């Protein structure tokens, strides 16, 4: 059998199936590789074996070699431990971004090269173009499925060795192609959520690793409303799962998480989705990553997303001496959350991004002041 030139990341889903089919139809020398990133805990939540069987079936239909690699140890060390540490620190991480950077476009790419390939391909909805002597990461043609947000940590070396064969397709087109090609995954439901959690209750999953630390739920005026099982189980803007019943002298309106203070173990809530405590027009990030290797300029304007599938928001970006960013938005933003990813765009091009560190939301400013006081005492 010929040494494959391209190794396709086979997830067992329809997207990677069509990615492999398209490359195979172009007479590329390819092979498929299925990654196991999580050891099944017995609840069958990741459906890993079912996905593996589907990946094997697709490779069989296409007549290409199938490979398997277990990256669960690497995933635990490089993605999951960070995920837990962020929640323990009161932040809301995005494990998909880290998984792409550390697993799919690092360990998977290294494995592909060990198998003799010079490129990898995945079923991501994104595009890569080469012009002006560098590689550019672009949004997928199907904006509703675009995954460039999760790929913003990639750099020139990874893009040079990567293909996104379905980036020019709309999802309905893709399913039609899969059906016409006789791929058994053509009607398979899209996976949602985080694999290692699956369909389980998120809070119950976290409790296995972060034991409950009950505390008070308060309103913006510091009035006690109820109790919570642990502030790290909640995120800004969250409405579900607060278990706040009828509160005396309060309207029967839903409650929203507007802040959390780890120092006092207090969860703050308000009854208005448009609460001023959820609004911000400025954020500071951790040091940024740039797809091109460097920022466009010390100060520049672009658009940004502070959460997946958010509309583009115009902003001004200032690069600080340590590589972190100060971002000023034209319009007020809702529930900008520390730990989540800020991703920057110039039209359809993804420039890069960074982890959100803090914002000018009222309770976030208070948390930052308390943290600064604590650090001064420790010093």
From Swiss-Prot:
Record-annotated disulphide pairs: 99-195
A GO MF label: ATP binding
Catalyzed chemical reaction(s): S-sulfanyl-L-cysteinyl-[protein] + uridine(34) in tRNA + AH2 + ATP = 2-thiouridine(34) in tRNA + L-cysteinyl-[protein] + A + AMP + diphosphate + H(+)
Gene giving rise to this polypeptide: mnmA
GO CC field: cytoplasm
Name recorded for this polypeptide: tRNA-specific 2-thiouridylase MnmA
Enzyme category, top tier: transferase
Function of the molecule: Catalyzes the 2-thiolation of uridine at the wobble position (U34) of tRNA, leading to the formation of s(2)U34.
Pfam families in UniProt: tRNA_Me_trans, tRNA_Me_trans_C, tRNA_Me_trans_M
InterPro entries noted in UniProt: MnmA-like (IPR004506), MnmA-like_C (IPR046885), MnmA-like_central (IPR046884), MnmA-like_central_sf (IPR023382), Rossmann-like_a/b/a_fold (IPR014729)
Organism, scientific name: Xylella fastidiosa (strain 9a5c)
